[in-house]
């Protein structure tokens, strides 16, 4: 038999209904602040309860347990711990920009220490908290019954300053959360006044007076673009960074000193995190971490090793610890009983409307009170003007009611006026008292007229709001604590975590690449080429050697006309004897694609620097280095190649320089680079040399009159010729003879300019390699055949050669070379 007290319900429907009720209760009545006073219900009840207890700044502190118990018993039946924790936060300087509670005792620390139990601590309202409740007894806000209908509590506080922005808010509701940063009081008040003076004001205009958040712990806000977006939309993110300085000790060592941490960061946890990073060797160069903070302020010291870079360590700390954090704006608040994400302008507008209502209701209350008092005084003045008749009526009456009725009938008085006459003391019958009553009455009439004028003129209401805000600003405003750094700051890149140093990049003929310390080789100018390679196989040699920096960019040009970009630190570091890493592991090269040239692009490269391209079919192109500033990971097309053409060489040309191009049939053309106009990256180029049928380009170099032109033929002949024998002519000619081509010496294998004191590395198509000094190669005329440089096996041909600078063995290690026949 079913119990009549049981009701069958659908579980799904009940869960939906109950959860919605619960969610709305949490959202509206617990977790989110009201846009008008910036308070959640618990904070509002704490302040109102303290005000009712009389725990004001001019009174002694009262036990926190007494305050908590009173608030819980009358207004907030949710447990004393939640009430006490909320009150503690309002008393912490690192949590609230302007504390609303003045705590006495242990109220915790920014290291995460908990406050003492509520039975040990004491509290009272702070001075600025009084401004939140000012005029609350003048019917400025609505009151409702408390949870048991035995008390009345305010729905919102008058809030004579914009507390939602000034102290911010954080809270997690059901399915939504709020995160509003604190701001400087003076700046926020200026923003309120700006909106009142100019309703058409933009977010950009507002940021002139309210540039951004002002956190109680100070620190730095990196960039303003995130602030503007958050103010415009209610959502956004900013980067907060610790305020640091690098000190140098008497012994010459460096130390990092942190004086301000980002908002809500626990510096004890930061300390523990740094120690853990050092132990795990994720950060190197730190010898000690100390927290020297005291009552004077925060001082967090990080000692740095003598040979370590404090700036690099600091950048690592910013990236790996909470010394740099993101603050996410989510300006969600209750407006008209509904949770909404609000822009800065909407928050200011809501506050202004609230203040207008407060001022109007207060003015109306004062006017009604003044009118009631004037009404009484008017009756007293009538009585004083007819005092003898009044006394006669009173004496003749047997009861108070009879006297009151007679007075009302005789002098046309109201019940309240007649009662006031009956209550009047005899001493007020004197002439002096009559003058006082008349003066008070006249003042009240003037006040009533003024209050009526305020109610009739909205502009006067606005002016009162601004005047009262100015008074709050005068009393409580202070200097900004958080510094706003101009310009947007991106997240820390890898190079910020790597110390800049000079290095050497080597690329072998077989495509092995590595990075070495500069000390591994003899010193060269950055961008230079040509020390011998080490650590390569017997059939390999270093074809490209570039002196650069770990922070500089390297451009890799391939035979297919594509370009790739790496920074110096992105190339793995190897020892001098290691062969390195195949370059295909770093660059996404096609199977038949190979690196032709490596160019160092220094960070301080001049604006007139150009890259000069030469293809096998004689096409040339000149393009500004700046065109290659942004290159994707999978490379970029450096020039358009046609008809199975391929890129031979890329030269870095600055200023007024000549170019020489050599062809397979033994011809060369020299012209000034200015003969080729600057072109875009995707351009095809123009004709640099007019090739004969079957001829191709085999080499191109920059040339000056102090250089020598080196040519090597496929059958092992070579020569050096002074550059002055190659006059500068126009672009696109067939060229002048640079070698006497015969069946004996073969076609040209290559052409390049040299200084004359380098070593020459030559390699054949069978893998045989020889190294010889250029002094062993005769200097002859332009149209000669040259001398035998390398004796080849039958059917073998020279395929490539390059120069390397001469270096002593003790500086570079053992040479790797395979001699050909003499």
UniProtKB/Swiss-Prot annotation:
Reaction(s) the record says it catalyses: ATP-dependent breakage, passage and rejoining of double-stranded DNA
The keyword Isomerase belongs to this UniProt entry's keyword annotation: yes
Source domain of life: Bacteria
Stored SUPFAM superfamilies: GyrA/ParC C-terminal domain-like (SSF101904), Type II DNA topoisomerase (SSF56719)
Domain Topo IIA-type catalytic: 32-497
Active site: 120
Class in the EC hierarchy, top level: isomerase
EC number(s) stated in the UniProt entry for this protein: 5.6.2.2
CDD domains the record matches: TOP4c (cd00187)
CC annotations in GO: chromosome; cytoplasm; DNA topoisomerase type II (double strand cut, ATP-hydrolyzing) complex
Further remark: Few gyrases are as efficient as E.coli at forming negative supercoils. Not all organisms have 2 type II topoisomerases; in organisms with a single type II topoisomerase this enzyme also has to decatenate newly replicated chromosomes.
NCBIfam families, per database record: gyrA (TIGR01063), PRK05560.1 (NF004043), PRK05561.1 (NF004044)
Protein name: DNA gyrase subunit A
